[in-house]
């Protein structure tokens, strides 16, 4: 968003492309509303075709995809010259770290390594509640045992995107 990609078509390219599995590419492309773009896309390449094969696509469809992309100059290899874009943004993929959104807004990113500390801090400062022993906990029976659920108990993971369900 800081780059100003709102209403833009964003294509990902570069030397790190071949290190990124297709499910990760799909997740990044599907998140374009979060980074403000109209669309996020990756070029068709061997990883795309391998994914199509591994997910049971008709071999004729895979061949057609490859043939068409190559005929149109859309098939990407490591030797493909860098396209001429109107603007670019460089991202060092070694700086990307796993993170979570919250506690209240998706843009409030929390590094996964900091999640435990951040959770305890948010419970105390944002919600004014202790993590354990606070009103609102619940007792449930699980596998024949009584279990206490408190704030912070992990009971379900919510996945909010159809693409992310295939790449949790």
Where are the predicted features?
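Fe-S-dependent hydro-lyases/dehydratases of central metabolism
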Residues: 1-168
């Amino acid at each position: 968003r800081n780059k100003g990609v709102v209403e833009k078509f964003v294509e990902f390219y570069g030397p790190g492309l071949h290190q990124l599995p297709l499910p990760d590419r799909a997740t990044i492309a599907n998140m374009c509303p979060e980074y403000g773009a109209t669309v996020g896309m990756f070029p068709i390449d061997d990883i795309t075709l391998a994914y199509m094969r591994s997910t049971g696509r008709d071999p004729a469809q895979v061949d057609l995809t490859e043939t068409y992309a190559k005929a149109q100059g859309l098939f990407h290899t490591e030797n493909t010259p860098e396209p001429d874009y109107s603007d670019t943004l460089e991202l060092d993929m070694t700086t990307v770290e796993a993170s979570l959104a919250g506690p209240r807004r998706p843009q409030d990113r929390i590094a996964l390594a900091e999640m435990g500390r951040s959770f305890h801090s948010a419970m105390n400062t944002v919600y004014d509640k202790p993590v354990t022993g606070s009103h609102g906990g619940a007792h449930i029976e699980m596998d024949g045992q009584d279990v206490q659920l408190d704030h912070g108990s992990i009971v379900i993971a919510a996945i909010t995107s159809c693409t992310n369900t295939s790449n949790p």
